[in-house]
A protein has these predicted regions:
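Conserved acidic donor-binding segment of nucleotide-sugar-dependent glycosyltransferases
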Residues: 308-309, 313-320, 329-334
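Short alpha-helical donor nucleotide-sugar binding micro-motif in glycosyltransferases
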Residues: 254-255, 262-267
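Short hydrophobic beta-strand element within catalytic cores of glycosyltransferases
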Residues: 293-296, 306
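Carbohydrate-associated surface elements
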Residues: 41, 152, 171
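Acidic donor-binding loop of glycosyltransferase active sites
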Residues: 265-279, 292
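Nucleotide-activated donor-binding/catalytic signature segment of Leloir-type glycosyltransferases, i.e.
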Residues: 238-255
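Conserved donor-binding/catalytic core segment of Leloir-type glycosyltransferases
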Residues: 186-214, 226
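Acidic anion/phosphate-binding donor-loop and adjacent secondary structure
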Residues: 127, 155, 172-187, 262, ...
Length: 372
């Protein structure tokens, strides 16, 4: 099949949607399908330059849903997208994210293929969607298949776009994170090690992990927090660290993507203190694939993937003391950490990308056959 994956969010913008698109594209092509990605340019430094990754327009980031999103601008976008679709004659156009994105909007408007959309977001309500509903309704009717990565994402999307959704979760490439990945030699001298991976923005909750660190250090004086990511809050976090826990935090800002599994392999406990607006939690899957126990906020999106007491433990959102206590409890119990790591690896195998890709392909085929 000829398949076009469309999103205003893609590398170098880091996050779950970018990961999802890349791995789905990679696996579709691995199975012999002619899959391409349509995404905007984010500037001069574009990772994953490939003839099958088509960059149209320029992305501009803006705050949304306690995070950063992007919208694409370009005077010739409508004509360029129409020309692309006419030339390629795709069988499937698959929107990743939101119908209100610029590329998604024009791709659906001009598409003559079977159209799918995967909703990744979680929000209590969207003023933008409410205002744009009358405009988008005519194009939403062109969607042949609705996918959500979780029941949380489905419930969020169906507030504005009711319909029958297929739940197909996010995936993880277990080969990237398996037990053969070596820990980083530069971190070997630190013990114990706590890991945070994510964008430096309010909803990821790094602030609460930094506030929890003094309590953890009081029990484990040599504890180190390794912070992997990038974002708008970096300067704020660095100031906090300088004043409170300078010797106990190591920043790895925007490391090469290939290094991320090595950070997971190096840690004793993985921590994700997000405060909400998460529909799934790909980083939890990555930690599970790496065999690491997890301390995560007890929020709806994380409950879709993590079982409290099995692959990790929940802590109360926005509560540094409870977060610290849960981390301390795991650091004290090596056997429990190893048990949770094994359970996590078992769950991650169920979300391996070849399995998830097959579920998506089966849904494509089901819809194509139904509409013949």
């Amino acid at each position: 099949m000829k398949i076009l994956l469309v999103s205003d969010i893609f590398y170098p913008h880091m996050g779950g949607v970018s990961e999802h698109i890349f791995h789905l594209w990679e696996n579709l092509r691995g199975l012999g399908h002619d899959a391409k990605i349509l995404a905007p340019s984010f500037g001069r430094n574009q990772p994953f330059v490939n003839e099958n990754i088509i960059r149209l327009g320029r992305a501009v980031k803006f705050p949304k849903n306690r995070s950063l999103s992007a919208i694409t601008f370009g005077f010739t976008l409508p004509w360029s997208i129409q020309k692309l679709l006419r030339r390629e004659q795709f069988d499937i156009v698959h929107i990743q994210g939101e119908l209100g994105q610029t590329l998604a909007y024009f791709a659906i408007k001009y598409s003559t293929a079977r159209n799918f959309i995967t909703f990744h977001s979680c929000h209590e309500g969207s003023l933008g969607y409410t205002l744009a509903e009358p405009l988008m309704e005519q194009y939403f009717r062109k969607i042949d298949g609705l996918i959500a990565v979780s029941t949380v994402a489905r419930d969020s999307a169906s507030q504005h776009f009711p319909g029958t959704y297929r739940i197909i979760p996010n995936g993880v490439d277990i080969r990237e994170f398996d037990g053969n990945v070596k820990p980083l030699a530069s971190l070997a001298k630190y013990d114990p090690k706590i890991l945070f991976v994510g964008r430096f923005e309010p909803r990821k909750g790094l602030k609460y992990l930094l506030q929890a660190l003094p309590r953890i250090i009081s029990v484990f004086p040599d504890a180190i927090l390794v912070v992997v990511g990038a974002g708008i809050m970096e300067r704020y976090y660095r100031r906090f660290i300088e004043e409170h826990v300078k010797e106990h935090v190591i920043f790895a800002v925007n490391p090469p993507r290939a290094d991320i599994p090595h950070y997971y392999a190096s840690c004793d406990v993985f921590c994700s203190p997000a405060i909400g607006a998460e529909s799934f939690g790909i980083i939890l899957l990555e930690a599970m694939a790496a065999g690491k126990p997890i301390v995560a906020s007890d929020i709806p999106g994380y409950r879709t993937i993590l079982v409290d007491g099995k692959e990790g433990v929940f802590c109360r959102p926005c509560d540094p003391d409870d977060l610290a206590d849960k981390v301390i409890a795991l650091l004290r119990d090596r056997d429990l950490r190893e048990q949770m790591g094994r359970a996590g690896r078992a769950k991650a195998r169920l979300h391996d990308w070849p399995i998830i890709t097959r579920q998506i392909l089966d849904f494509y085929t089901e819809v194509l056959n139904h509409n013949q």
